[in-house]
Each structure stands twice: as C-alpha cells, then as structure tokens.
Amino acid sequence: LIHRATKVPVGKDQEQHLELTRRFARRFNNIYGVEFFPEPQNFNFGHDAVKVPGLDGSGKMGKSEGNCISLIDEEKVIRKKVMKAVTDEGPKTPDSEMSEPIKNLFTILDLVSTPDTVAYFTEQYKNCSIRYGDLKKQLAEDILKYTLPIKERYADIINDEAYLRKVVTCGAERARA
C-alpha cells in the first residue's frame, strides 16, 4: 500500500495477501472519504499463476520449506538438490497414475524443458521404462539452461556499482517524496 501500486506480481499462494491489502485500502478510503490507496490487482505477465512444486514431493517450492532451487544457485548446488529430489519405486503397470513426488518433477520439467523432452519422459513413464536418475539429470541440465540468463543478468547488476548506487539514490528520493 505504501507504494500505491496498482499491479503486483504475486504467485497463486500469495493472492490471499493481496486480497487482504485490497480490503485495507477500501477501508482506509471509506473511513477518510478519499481515494488515496488504489486497490492492487494481481499481475502475471499474461499467464495463469503457477505453483512450482517442491523437490521433497509435497506442497510448493519454498525457501522456508527447504525444498527450493534459487534462481542464482550454483551449478553444483542445483544438481545436488535435483538428484536428492524425492521419487517412488517407479510405475508397475503401463499408464499408471503418477505419485505426487513424480507429478512434482514432471511439473518442473514442463516449466523448464522442451516439449520433446517432456514427451520423451512421459512416454518412458507410461511404458514403465523410466529411469528416475536419467530424468533428474535431464531436469538439472534444463534448470541450469533455463536459469543461465537470469544468473548472467544478476551478475551484471551486482557487479555494476554505479548502477546500484543510482538505484539506491533514486529509491531513497522516491521514498522521501
């Protein structure tokens, strides 16, 4: 509210917080008879909000849950986290339903991999020939490929002291205004 934002990029799991913020804005505006605080709306870049599942086979991915991959994690760390992801004993019958931990891995695969890769591993699962080690290795590679531009941009920003000073100065001026 303090920034009087009209659009806020939040995930599906944070929408209830945004609704609470809208209620606060409405209440303040009604009590004081002004339109001071806009009611912020969820912003999602034209896509439905996606809940990224955790690597431990349950719930969402999150730092507090200890089951997340940071966008700036080092290569070795990402590989280690993915290889430790929870799996099951594998499908016993063709076209069997996936367990929750496996669905989670396939959801992440769908987010970072090519459709051909997803189709390949889906077919492997359906015909009971999937090797989870191969799936995890491919998933780690695809996560690394997906996060590389983010890491490069982060490194550019973090190493540009002049830019960082400018951002801090502008931010401080806007906060005081």
Question: Which residues does each PLM region occupy?
Answer:
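Conserved nucleotide- and phosphate/pyrophosphate-binding catalytic cores
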Residues: Q16, R22-A177
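Conserved alpha/beta enzyme-core scaffolds, especially Rossmann-like or related mixed alpha/beta domains
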Residues: L1-Q14, I158
